[in-house]
């Protein structure tokens, strides 16, 4: 009787562990729904005090004094890889299949669609920044010449490397 009871308890705990493991593993990665902000109550408007009429004064020209600290002129910013990628660079790991197939590292012809769909809504500069970030972080898992790899990936997705852009 005791062995039957302990077997039931063991089965109960095993099923609980399996249940909790499965529920924890099914995280959909969905963004949580936005929380509604409470509507603030209207604040009472202050009553404006009557303004006195200004008395006109004679205008006396004053000599112009040069500013002691002139504002330095900043040079125009050239596009570089200093921007931030608006998408998660780890998601660009799907571009590894595209890049490796183009370089004949892998047999078969994987679709470029998953990679290109990630950068589809981005302008060329943002797409270049994202792919540059992924290549520099070696998210793709391939050690390659970064500028050439960047150019190859952008060309596959019908994008162009912005002029003056350097992935350093």
From Swiss-Prot:
Gene3D superfamilies: Plant lipid-transfer and hydrophobic proteins (1.10.110.10). Residues 58-67 are annotated as: 2 X 58 AA tandem repeats B of P-S-V-P-S. Belongs to the plant LTP family. PEARLI1 subfamily. Residues 32-81 are annotated as: Disordered. Residues 39-78 have a biased composition (Pro residues). Residues 1-25 form the signal peptide. It comes from the Eukaryota. Induction: Transient accumulation in response to toxic levels of aluminum (Al). Stably activated by vernalization; vernalization and subsequent growth in long-day photoperiods have an additive or synergistic effect on this activation. Induced by both cold and salt. Residues 34-57 are annotated as: 3 X 8 AA repeats A of P-K-[HP]-K-P-V-P-S. Mostly expressed in aerial part of seedlings, and, to a lower extent, in roots. Higher basal levels in early-flowering ecotypes. It is found in: Secreted, Cell wall. GO terms for cellular component: chloroplast outer membrane; endoplasmic reticulum; extracellular region; plant-type cell wall; plasmodesma; secretory vesicle. Probable lipid transfer protein (LTP). May improve freezing survival. Seems to control the flowering process and lignin synthesis. Has an auxiliary role for germinability and early seedling development under low temperature and salt stress conditions, probably in an abscisic acid- (ABA) dependent manner. Confers resistance to Botrytis cinerea and exhibits anti-fungal activity, at least against S.cerevisiae, B.cinerea and Fusarium oxysporum, probably by increasing their membrane permeability. B- repeats lie at residues 58-62, 63-67. Keywords: Cell wall, Plant defense, Repeat, Secreted, Signal. This is Lipid transfer protein EARLI 1. One of its GO terms (biological process) is induced systemic resistance. Disruption phenotype: Increased tendency for freezing-induced cellular damage. Reduced cutin accumulation due to lower cutin biosynthesis. Early flowering in long-day conditions. A- repeats lie at residues 34-41, 42-49, 50-57. The gene is EARLI1. InterPro entries: Bifun_inhib/LTP/seed_sf, Bifunc_inhib/LTP/seed_store, Hydrophob_seed_dom, Plant_LTP/defense-related. Pfam families: Hydrophob_seed (PF14547). It comes from Arabidopsis thaliana (Mouse-ear cress).
């Amino acid at each position: 009787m005791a062995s039957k009871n302990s077997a039931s308890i063991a089965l109960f705990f095993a099923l609980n562990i399996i249940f909790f493991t499965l529920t924890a593993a099914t995280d959909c990665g969905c963004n949580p729904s936005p929380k509604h902000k409470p509507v603030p109550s209207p604040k009472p408007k202050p009553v404006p005090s009557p303004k006195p009429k200004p008395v006109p004064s004679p205008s006396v020209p004053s000599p112009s004094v040069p500013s002691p600290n002139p504002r330095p002129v900043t040079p125009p910013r050239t596009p570089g890889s200093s921007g931030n990628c608006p998408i998660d660079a780890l998601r660009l790991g799907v571009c590894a299949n595209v890049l490796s197939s183009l370089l004949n590292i892998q047999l078969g012809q994987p679709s470029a669609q998953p990679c290109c769909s990630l950068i589809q809504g981005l302008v060329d500069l943002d797409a270049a920044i994202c792919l540059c970030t992924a290549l520099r972080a070696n998210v793709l898992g391939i050690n390659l010449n970064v500028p050439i790899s960047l150019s190859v990936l952008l060309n596959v997705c019908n994008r162009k490397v912005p002029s003056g852009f350097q992935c350093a």
